[in-house]
């Protein structure tokens, strides 16, 4: 059984009910809507289509809204045509948005471009394909030396590696997009270009103000500033997306894998979900099979401990969206089989909180008894994530009376969530847990299961782990 979850970006190729149903069958767990593209009518229809499929089939999936985020882009060029730049030439950026650009100058969307940069800084355009060095700053112009040949286009992203920029966490478009997400009842927001804790706080306040207090925030780490402030960002977020595309432009490419490993490890310790994203099966946008390196990249992220791996263009616009999900699911399943539990008996001398100690003990018991299932009663999902932290061989069955929690746990590795009407007592939980375990096929008659519960009130302390035979 696949434990690692798959996030699929949905686009024109995959938005129909028929395709969404096939994607769910192939292994999709979360639908990602990329708000850098598309309008509300398109995204609203995709949400409706997925909900129709879930209601008809009983399949489960969560919905993630990915914001465009604060970014710097080039503006107009003469005739809308790309211009060729040559290594060694002088090129100018201006904050005067009325300027129509050519092969010597282009306007950018960010007013603070001149004040944030210094002579000697690097400017990268179009995902780093064109590099420039700042040689002078004059009024509203930044004058650069072009470092390599390349074609510059309109509306291309501009990165300033190592530069702290004063862009707001929420652009006006993002604010409207988040209100749309609140109205639609999405489960997660992936917040782009998060640089510091206050960015997350601002987004959370905006969500709360529009009825989205239950939406979980997944912060995307895409630049050096986000890495520098990672601990405070993690503390304020519900999860992290390792967004390797922009990150690989902002920091040296050889550093990306180490940043990935650091972020995943810290998320595991903090019991926060983590998604590894970008270019995972990139060649499958055009080809029916991935490269060996891509397959290894997916497996490596799973071995690092990621909750989920993500498809972007592969599932949104590629030629082989279904094949991409199927192959990714196969890699997940194969790699999940060799994942060892992480109890770290010898290295862990920390004093644990009650919930953590009970959940750790439950995993230890399940490992020793070779139990196929750990059943957890959870209101907000914390107990299920506390068990997941130790990567048990057993599947985690999370019973909850909270519909939002049931959907959000879809993103957590190794967790199968089940919505139940009520849990009135510990005995009630034991009875329900055994019934669901058998009905779902996650365990068979005669199997040993470990059951974890606690105070049956919202956010109660988990304080009991017990062993049962079905």
UniProtKB/Swiss-Prot annotation:
One GO term in the molecular function aspect is:
pyruvate kinase activity
Q: Does the keyword Nucleotide-binding belong to this entry? A: yes
Q: Which residues bind substrate?
A: 32, 245-246, 278
Q: What is its EC number?
A: 2.7.1.40
Q: Which CDD domains does this chain map to?
A: Pyruvate_Kinase
Q: What InterPro entries is this protein classified in?
A: Pyr_Knase, Pyrv/PenolPyrv_kinase-like_dom, Pyrv_kinase-like_dom_sf, Pyrv_Knase-like_insert_dom_sf, Pyrv_Knase_AS, Pyrv_Knase_brl, Pyrv_Knase_C, Pyrv_Knase_C_sf
The positions annotated for binding Mg(2+) are 222, 246
Cofactor(s) the protein needs:
Mg(2+); K(+)
Per the UniProt record, the site (Transition state stabilizer) maps to 220
What is the catalytic activity of this protein? pyruvate + ATP = phosphoenolpyruvate + ADP + H(+)
Q: What class of enzyme is it?
A: transferase
- Is Transmembrane there in the keyword field? no
Q: Which residues bind ATP?
A: 34-37, 73, 156
Q: Give the metabolic or biological pathway.
A: Carbohydrate degradation; glycolysis; pyruvate from D-glyceraldehyde 3-phosphate: step 5/5
Positions that bind K(+): 34, 36, 66-67
Output the SUPFAM superfamilies linked to this UniProt entry.
Phosphoenolpyruvate/pyruvate domain, PK beta-barrel domain-like, PK C-terminal domain-like
Recite the UniProt keywords alphabetically.
Answer: ATP-binding, Glycolysis, Kinase, Magnesium, Metal-binding, Nucleotide-binding, Potassium, Pyruvate, Transferase
NCBIfam families annotated for this entry? Answer: PRK05826.1 (NF004491), PRK06354.1 (NF004978), PRK09206.1 (NF006664), pyruv_kin (TIGR01064)
Subunit structure of this entry?
A: Homotetramer.
Q: What is this protein called?
A: Pyruvate kinase I
Q: Which organism is it from?
A: Salmonella typhi
